[in-house]
Amino acid sequence: MSIDVDAVSDLIRDVSARVIDPRFRTLDDHQIHQKKPGDFVTDADRQAERELGAAVTKYAGGIVVGEESAFADPTILDAVSDADLAWVIDPIDGTKNFVHGSVDHGVMLAQLNRGETVRGWIWQPQHGHMWFAEHGAGVTCDGDEVTRGDSHSPVRAATTHEVYKIPSPVVEWRMAKWCCAVDYPLVCQDENDVTVYQHSYPWDHLPGALMVREVGGVVRTVEGAEYGPRETSGKLIVAADEEAVSYTHLTLPTNRE
């Protein structure tokens, strides 16, 4: 079937409005859990994943892999690469921010056809922005085309790693937002040139990686491999262009004398 991208956007907004937004800054302690120390999940995450997964499969079919279901059973990721249609969901990206009352959180959804990310959505409910990318068709924010220029000098790079505290003449390090649903758009809209991530889980990165590539950027492991849905453990460099990648590599701890 032909998938109406606006209809999918509406499904995301609907789940957010009913399940996530009413719980923002109103969570009780018993609604907040930790999968491991510092790795938060809330009742809103779990319900939103269930409801969004049910909504997209009712609308278009396919299989669903969500962050919380994959945490419970990592083997479900194996089916994504071979499925004709798969949906990868991060019900609340930036859950730690959400728990602590920060507006920097979002809902992310990727559509994969036989292991290739063909569409990606990022909904930022407290900022009111819907980001969308389609392979070969570019990126939009609230329906408006998104483009960006070459990287800045010095390169504007964000991370949560301690390297952001190290002065560099070629890279201006800053603290990332602890939320891929915010940090990826910051690269797309020319605010940052680079984001370095410590993990590469598909629900965190597939929608944003497509967006960055669609505005001319690159998304690779620090070892140089192109990022894809099978990558689940490596560190990533998300960059506006090759020059930004090169300068960032010079300042990473493994490349410093």
Regions found by a protein language model. Name each.
Residues 20, 45, 56, 95, ...:
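Residue-level signal for inorganic ion chemistry
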Residues 80-136:
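DPxDG-like acidic metal-binding loop motif
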Residues 46, 68, 91-94, 125, ...:
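Generic detector of well-ordered alpha-helical packing
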Residues 1-92:
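N-terminal subdomain of lithium-sensitive/metallo-dependent phosphomonoesterases centered on the IMPase/IPPase/PAP
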Residues 142-143:
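Short strand-turn-strand beta-turns centered on an Asx-Gly dipeptide
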Residues 148-252:
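An extended, acidic
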Residues 254-257:
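Single conserved hydrophobic/aromatic residue that forms the stacking wall/gate
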